[in-house]
Amino acid sequence: MARIAGVDIPRDKRVEVALTYIYGIGLTRAKTILTKSGVNPDIRVKDLEDGDVQKLRTALEAFTIEGDLRRQEGMALKRLQDIGCLRGRRHRMSLPVRGQRTRTNARTRRGARKTVAGKKK
């Protein structure tokens, strides 16, 4: 397995697909990186030469990926919560953030149903 950006890339996959195992890199960005670095996207990771791996590493330095990206996203959410805006409060309460209804639906975000004791008649 080649190790790029702190991630073990699967050996038997094409380079184009293997790069998507890195957090922050999808198929479109992987194609862009391969084009810039001049690496053939159709070869397998196990067939890459050391020079090709080094080219990929230098091309990846231009992007925010892995731990830096996770930290950046976490800081953005924390900032919203700290300033007390509606989006931050909704994140804190684990409710939908973008204006969706919650009287029905929103089960994924709200979690499993909690039984509330009803009044007896």
Swiss-Prot record:
PROSITE patterns: RIBOSOMAL_S13_1, RIBOSOMAL_S13_2. Keywords: Ribonucleoprotein, Ribosomal protein, RNA-binding, rRNA-binding, tRNA-binding. Signal peptide: none annotated. SUPFAM superfamilies: S13-like H2TH domain. GO terms for molecular function: rRNA binding; structural constituent of ribosome; tRNA binding. Residues 97-121 are annotated as: Disordered. The keyword Chaperone does not apply. GO terms for biological process: translation. One of its GO terms (cellular component) is small ribosomal subunit. Residues 100-121 have a biased composition (Basic residues). Pfam families: Ribosomal_S13 (PF00416). InterPro entries: Rbsml_uS13_C, Ribosomal_uS13, Ribosomal_uS13-like_H2TH, Ribosomal_uS13_bac-type, Ribosomal_uS13_CS. Part of the 30S ribosomal subunit. Forms a loose heterodimer with protein S19. Forms two bridges to the 50S subunit in the 70S ribosome. PANTHER family: 30S RIBOSOMAL PROTEIN S13/40S RIBOSOMAL PROTEIN S18 (PTHR10871), SMALL RIBOSOMAL SUBUNIT PROTEIN US13M (PTHR10871:SF1). HAMAP family: Ribosomal_uS13. Belongs to the universal ribosomal protein uS13 family. Located at the top of the head of the 30S subunit, it contacts several helices of the 16S rRNA. In the 70S ribosome it contacts the 23S rRNA (bridge B1a) and protein L5 of the 50S subunit (bridge B1b), connecting the 2 subunits; these bridges are implicated in subunit movement. Contacts the tRNAs in the A and P-sites. NCBIfam families: uS13_bact (TIGR03631). This is Small ribosomal subunit protein uS13. It comes from Prochlorococcus marinus (strain MIT 9303).
